[in-house]
């Protein structure tokens, strides 16, 4: 089977990672001891994508848990599914990264990285046919951002032909832990642009807005935000975990979603939005799901898709529903909003349907969009970065760990280039190309 090795790094990465394993273990009928208690063959058919089968029929997540301090891992271990993980796969330091990207990437993280790679290698070697890696981390802290990106580049070196997929939590001033988040995020994006194949941008700003506006939670906690993240992660991995035709592995997803290698930052969305512990009082119809899924308010990245255009889209519907109706609704969305889809990639919307809905819902839909509007998110970080960097504020924390100012300047310009690349394809039309070609032919003649 096509296995995925999952890594989680730093406090945020471990918290959303632990939540992800709770949710998918539940969907696959696996209890906290790793025993299967499910009721459907579909749950086991592709179980080895994320789980190893151990002696005595126990299922163990193929997960590597990494942090530079023991705190978060202790709470994962004592959490509801803490005993399901392989004890050797907890790799942690004692020093912490102090929200400093340089500590995670160059000093503290670099000391720990080899022991992490040993565990990763061991997991990869026991795979029948490894398809790739997924990492959950945040871009605002020190460990997830600094050490997370270090791990990515090391794994890339060792497994250059495997897919690298990340779930990256983007910082926001609305839910801010540290003042240097824009630095850490910019330095991380600089790495992600070059070293990942697919990155889901999970934006704290958007999660906060959803909790506040849609779910009417006056003081959203990280638990509330993580509930949304785990629903989204469960949705986008559905095609990988359950039998189906479309985007059934990471590489096929990348082929469908990434028209240009640098533009691999996806905007996830989810419908229906529910708050923790609440139940839906009525099942939504397919048209409602489709309409909600494309709504800017349901996006997990704080960008308005109406300010850009979609290069590609993948949608995953879950639950028992009519395929015909799903196809009709998806076509309907494209026809009504055709100006929001680039016309130079025909058939750029793909839809998958999976029979098994997430817990507590009859039907749900997950949205994965590669939209040029994601540049708004990078612009937001870039502005905050520049404001501090032009005064060289807080730089000594980074230079003290051996970093050079030059690296900041490079990261800044790489991010600005990324923004202009998105803009360039947003403005591109199908006709333009023809004109250029004609001119070129004349010159040749």
Curated annotation (Swiss-Prot):
Naturally occurring in which organism (per UniProt): Homo sapiens
Amino-acid positions noted as binding Mg(2+) in the UniProt annotation, renumbered to this chain: 69
Quaternary structure note: Dimer of alpha and beta chains. A typical microtubule is a hollow water-filled tube with an outer diameter of 25 nm and an inner diameter of 15 nM. Alpha-beta heterodimers associate head-to-tail to form protofilaments running lengthwise along the microtubule wall with the beta-tubulin subunit facing the microtubule plus end conferring a structural polarity. Microtubules usually have 13 protofilaments but different protofilament numbers can be found in some organisms and specialized cells. Component of sperm flagellar doublet microtubules.
PTM sites of type Phosphothreonine: 55
GO terms, molecular function: double-stranded RNA binding; GTP binding; GTPase activity; metal ion binding; MHC class I protein binding; structural constituent of cytoskeleton; unfolded protein binding
CDD domains: beta_tubulin
Sequence positions that bind GTP: 11, 69, 138, 142-144, 204, 226
Disorder cited: Leber congenital amaurosis with early-onset deafness: An autosomal dominant disease characterized by severe retinal degeneration and sensorineural hearing loss. Symptoms occur within the first decade of life. Onset at birth is observed in some patients.
Family note: Belongs to the tubulin family.
Changes after translation: Some glutamate residues at the C-terminus are polyglutamylated, resulting in polyglutamate chains on the gamma-carboxyl group. Polyglutamylation plays a key role in microtubule severing by spastin (SPAST). SPAST preferentially recognizes and acts on microtubules decorated with short polyglutamate tails: severing activity by SPAST increases as the number of glutamates per tubulin rises from one to eight, but decreases beyond this glutamylation threshold. Glutamylation is also involved in cilia motility. Some glutamate residues at the C-terminus are monoglycylated but not polyglycylated due to the absence of functional TTLL10 in human. Monoglycylation is mainly limited to tubulin incorporated into cilia and flagella axonemes, which is required for their stability and maintenance. Flagella glycylation controls sperm motility. Both polyglutamylation and monoglycylation can coexist on the same protein on adjacent residues, and lowering glycylation levels increases polyglutamylation, and reciprocally.
The record's note on its domains: The highly acidic C-terminal region may bind cations such as calcium.
Cellular component annotations (GO), alphabetically ordered: axonemal microtubule; azurophil granule lumen; cytoplasm; cytoskeleton; cytosol; extracellular exosome; extracellular region; extracellular vesicle
UniProt region (Disordered), positions on chain: 426-445
Protein name according to UniProt: Tubulin beta-4B chain
Gene, per the UniProt record: TUBB4B
Modified residues (5-glutamyl polyglutamate): 438
Organism taxonomic ancestry: Eukaryota, Metazoa, Chordata, Craniata, Vertebrata
Pfam families, sorted: Tubulin (PF00091), Tubulin_C (PF03953)
Chain positions found as Phosphoserine: 172
Record keywords, A-Z: Acetylation, Cell projection, Cilium, Cytoplasm, Cytoskeleton, Deafness, Disease variant, Flagellum, GTP-binding, Isopeptide bond, Leber congenital amaurosis, Magnesium, Metal-binding, Microtubule, Nucleotide-binding, Phosphoprotein
Location in the cell: Cytoplasm, Cytoskeleton; Cytoplasm, Cytoskeleton, Flagellum axoneme
Tissue: Ubiquitous.
Requisite cofactors: Mg(2+)
């Amino acid at each position: 089977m096509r296995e995925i090795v999952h890594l989680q790094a730093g406090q945020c990465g471990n918290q959303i990672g632990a939540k992800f394993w709770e949710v998918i273990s539940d969907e696959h009928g696996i209890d906290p001891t790793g025993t299967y208690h499910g009721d459907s063959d579909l749950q086991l058919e592709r179980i080895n994508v994320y789980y190893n089968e151990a002696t005595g029929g126990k299922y163990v997540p193929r997960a590597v848990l990494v942090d530079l301090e023991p705190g978060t891992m202790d709470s994962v271990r004592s959490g509801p599914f803490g005993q399901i993980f392989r004890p050797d796969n907890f790799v942690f330091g004692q020093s912490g990264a102090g929200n400093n990207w340089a500590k995670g990437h160059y000093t503290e993280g670099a000391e720990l990285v080899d022991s992490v790679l040993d565990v990763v290698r061991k997991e990869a070697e026991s795979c029948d046919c490894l398809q790739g890696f997924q990492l959950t981390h945040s871009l605002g802290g020190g460990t997830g951002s600094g050490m997370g990106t270090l791990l990515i580049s090391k794994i890339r070196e060792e497994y250059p032909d495997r897919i690298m997929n990340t779930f990256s939590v983007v910082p926001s001033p609305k839910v801010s832990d540290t003042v240097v988040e824009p630095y850490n995020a910019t330095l991380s994006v600089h790495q992600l642009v070059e070293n990942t194949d697919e990155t889901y941008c999970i934006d704290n700003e958007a999660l906060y807005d959803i909790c506040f506006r849609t779910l009417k939670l006056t003081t959203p906690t990280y638990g509330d935000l993580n509930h949304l993240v785990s629903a989204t992660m469960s949705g986008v991995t559905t095609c990988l975990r359950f039998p189906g035709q479309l985007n059934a592995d990471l590489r096929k997803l990348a082929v469908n979603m990434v028209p240009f290698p640098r533009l691999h930052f996806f905007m996830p969305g989810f419908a229906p939005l529910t708050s923790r512990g609440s139940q839906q009082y009525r099942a939504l119809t397919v048209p409602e799901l489709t309409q909600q899924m494309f709504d800017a308010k349901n996006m997990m990245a704080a960008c308005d898709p109406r300010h850009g255009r979609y290069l590609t889209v993948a949608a995953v519907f879950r639950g028992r529903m009519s395929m015909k109706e799903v196809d009709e609704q998806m076509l309907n969305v494209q026809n009504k909003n055709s100006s929001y889809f680039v016309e130079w990639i025909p058939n750029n919307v793909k839809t998958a349907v999976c029979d098994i809905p997430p817990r507590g819902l009859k039907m749900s839909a997950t949205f994965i969009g590669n939209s040029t509007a994601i540049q708004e998110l990078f612009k937001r970080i870039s502005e905050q970065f520049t404001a501090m960097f032009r005064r060289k504020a807080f730089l000594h924390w980074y230079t003290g760990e051996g970093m050079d100012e030059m690296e900041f300047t490079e990261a800044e310009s790489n991010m600005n280039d990324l923004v202009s690349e998105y803009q360039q394809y947003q403005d591109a039309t199908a006709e333009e190309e023809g004109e250029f070609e004609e001119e070129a032919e004349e010159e040749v003649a």
